[in-house]
A protein has these predicted regions:
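Bacterial N-terminal signal peptides that target proteins for export
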Residues: 1-8
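C-terminal motif of bacterial Sec signal peptides marking the signal peptidase cleavage site
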Residues: 17-19
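Bacterial signal peptide processing site
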Residues: 21-24
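Chitinase-like catalytic core of GlcNAc-active glycosidases
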Residues: 30-42, 67-199
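A structural motif corresponding to the C-terminal end of an alpha-helix
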Residues: 59, 95-102, 134-142, 170-174, ...
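Structural recognition of alpha->loop->beta junctions
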Residues: 60, 133, 137-146, 189-206, ...
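Substrate-binding surface in catalytic domains of secreted glycosidases
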Residues: 158, 162-251
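Substrate-binding cleft of secreted/luminal carbohydrate-active enzymes
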Residues: 236, 242-244, 249-323
Length: 323
């Protein structure tokens, strides 16, 4: 008969092995995600204005999805041809410490050409995590998850899904999580191997179509997409607050102008804005359709910009964030 201490040691070893096996399968000991008021930062320079810092405090923002960099392609001079490279890296002009107790989620935008030319998706995953680590270390950011953003289609779905598996495996080894943005058209397919998704409720119609009234957000389009959809992952929801001017000439799309830019151009201009009533209508359209896996969803605003956010009252912002 074994000594009680030997039995205790045996049990401890078995529990440790089971935990390690769970790590290899991509499991985590506890969810890395919790519901919170959140907002995106989608600029190449991080330097929030006093208004934007006050917005974070006033509306009790606890999570900031901060775009770190894009993964594009470049022709390298080592004979290897096109290779994935980081581009449009965010420059930090201000310290994250100045926004208080806000969790920062690094976001990486993956271009389709980068997916297609990567030597291996495992090596791409390693490079992404290494760069996120370096940027977090340099800017004193402690992170618990990474988010990938990619406009994948059914054709490129296998590549992006494999990248998600590789990134998630590397993150779960460190007890960190992986999320991904999900566009409405992507809900028709199964979702990638992620811990949760963020459903992007903007750009719901084609901005290049001259006959569309408002391409940013149409609650009718959202309702139609959600009618026959049940997501197989937990989803949070991102709502737009931005505005823009679309330029057409001879019914052909020419480009996007920002409010304040010179609009003395030849052709037709269409002003579009995120409307509060459409945001609330979209919230009502999606809630009954999605699976609850044990914790409530978060509402997220896109994005942290004083010129756009100042168009909304404090009450309207509170209603957008209301569960």
């Amino acid at each position: 008969m074994k000594h009680p201490l030997q039995l205790l040691a045996f049990v401890c070893i078995m529990l440790t092995l089971m935990a390690c096996a769970d790590d290899r399968r991509g499991g985590t000991a506890e969810p890395v995600h919790h519901p919170a008021n959140a907002i995106y930062h989608w600029k190449t320079v991080y330097n929030p204005t006093p208004y934007e810092k006050d917005f974070l405090k006033k509306h009790q923002i606890k999570r900031l999805y901060l775009k770190f960099f894009d993964v594009g392609v470049d022709n390298l001079y080592d004979g290897k041809g096109e290779q994935p490279v980081p581009i449009a890296t965010t420059i930090f002009r201000d310290s994250i410490k100045h926004i208080g107790d806000v969790e920062v989620v690094p976001v990486v935008f993956i271009t389709i050409p980068a997916l297609k030319c990567a030597p291996t998706l495992y090596s791409l995953a390693e490079h992404i995590i290494d760069r996120v680590d370096d940027m977090c270390w340099a800017n004193h950011i402690a992170y618990r998850e990474v988010q990938l953003d990619c406009d994948w289609t059914r054709e490129t779905k296998p590549l992006f899904f494999e990248l998600c598996r590789e990134v998630r495996f590397l993150l779960h080894e460190r007890r960190k999580g992986l999320s991904a943005t999900i566009r409405l058209h992507q809900l028709r397919d199964t979702l990638p191997d992620i811990d949760y998704g963020v459903l992007m409720l903007y750009n719901t119609e084609s901005l290049v179509n001259p006959d569309v009234r408002n391409s940013i957000l149409s609650s009718d389009v959202v309702r139609e997409y959600m009618r026959h959809v049940e997501a197989d992952k937990h989803l949070d929801f991102a709502f737009p607050t931005f505005q823009w001017i679309l330029w057409f000439k001879d019914r052909k799309f020419q480009g996007i102008l920002r409010p304040g830019q010179d609009t003395n151009v030849e052709g037709c201009l269409r002003y579009e804005a995120s409307l509060y009533r459409e945001i609330i209508a979209a919230k009502r359209a999606i809630r009954p359709c999605l699976k609850d896996i044990g914790y409530p969803s978060s509402n997220i605003i896109y994005h942290l910009d004083s010129a756009n956010l100042s168009r909304f009252t404090d009450h309207e912002i509170s209603e957008i964030y209301r569960p």
